[in-house]
Amino acid sequence: MELDKIIPTDGPNINEVEKYINKYQSEVIVIKCGGSVLLDKKLFNQFIEDISVINKIGLSAIVVHGGGKNIKKKLDENNIETRFIKGLRVSDEKTIRYIEEALLELNLEILHELKSKNTNVCSISPKENNVINIIPESKELGYVGKPKTINKEKILNFIKNKQIPIVVPLGLGDDGRIYILMQMLLQVQLQKRSMPDVFF
């Protein structure tokens, strides 16, 4: 592997990168990307560069992204009033439709930018390669849930094919409907249930 052609010139030295690769080559990195990173062009470009390098040096990773500010913008544009209960957004049938739209737009943007750098990625969402089965959180919150099961085999198959799954914090309930999850909760559940060895 010609690391000097992969690592940015202002990045760490090659000896340090080789140590990092040797240490973590048998593990899976679970990366949380918050909505603030996605809205800041400089941070977003750095995030894309980092994920691309991780893929090209042969490390395995999963990216879970949020999008709270993008969701708020989408709801405001459509005059949807937001209510919160204990810090969680109440999501009725109309609200969840716009939440899904905002998150899928973000997911598509991340995929597009990574593919433009020849990074091997795939989308994980209720519409494409769904792996998350949901339990509703409460009737009060509407379409808000937590993971019931996560399809470990499906995720590992993507990773074995040298792909980085880009995961939307959405899943399907037993009723076939889409639910939103807390991003951090999803990250923790991926670590506990899906991966043999993870770090972040």
Locate each region found by the language model:
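Nucleotide/pyrophosphate-binding catalytic subdomain
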Residues: 1-200
